[in-house]
Amino acid sequence: MKTLLLTLVVVTIVCLDFGHTLICYNYETPLDKTTECCGNGVTTCFAKSWRDHRGLRTDRGCGCPNVKPGVTINCCKTDRCNG
């Protein structure tokens, strides 16, 4: 619990700036919901999903990357919208 609180404090401090910095989730499993501050000019978050030998996989982060066929991607423009 202390680690989670410390992580949230660090993310808050790092993301404080005079403009708005987008915050996106960057976790792969729902058990470890971590976030990242996107760089200047990045205005979207993404969540992409695909199936492999391990089952359904999901990746999250800043931006809106191009994906290969068979990969589903959802992009959005608000803080933590890719959860």
From Swiss-Prot:
Keyword Kinase (UniProt): no
Gene3D superfamilies membership: CD59 (2.10.60.10)
The organism's place on the tree of life at top rank: Eukaryota
Family according to the record: Belongs to the three-finger toxin family. Short-chain subfamily. Type I alpha-neurotoxin sub-subfamily.
Keyword field: Acetylcholine receptor inhibiting toxin, Disulfide bond, Ion channel impairing toxin, Neurotoxin, Postsynaptic neurotoxin, Secreted, Signal, Toxin
Region forming the signal peptide: 1-21
Role summary: Binds to muscle nicotinic acetylcholine receptor (nAChR) and inhibit acetylcholine from binding to the receptor, thereby impairing neuromuscular transmission.
Compartments, record wording: Secreted
PROSITE patterns found in the cross-reference section: SNAKE_TOXIN
Molecular-function GO term, any one: acetylcholine receptor inhibitor activity
Pfam families assigned: Toxin_cobra-type
Transmembrane segments: none
Tissue-wise expression: Expressed by the venom gland.
Disulphide bridges: 24-45, 38-62, 64-75, 76-81
GO cellular component, one term: extracellular region
Protein's UniProt name: Three-finger toxin MALT0066C
Description of how the protein assembles with itself and partners: Dimer.
Organism encoding this protein: Micrurus altirostris (Uruguayan coral snake)
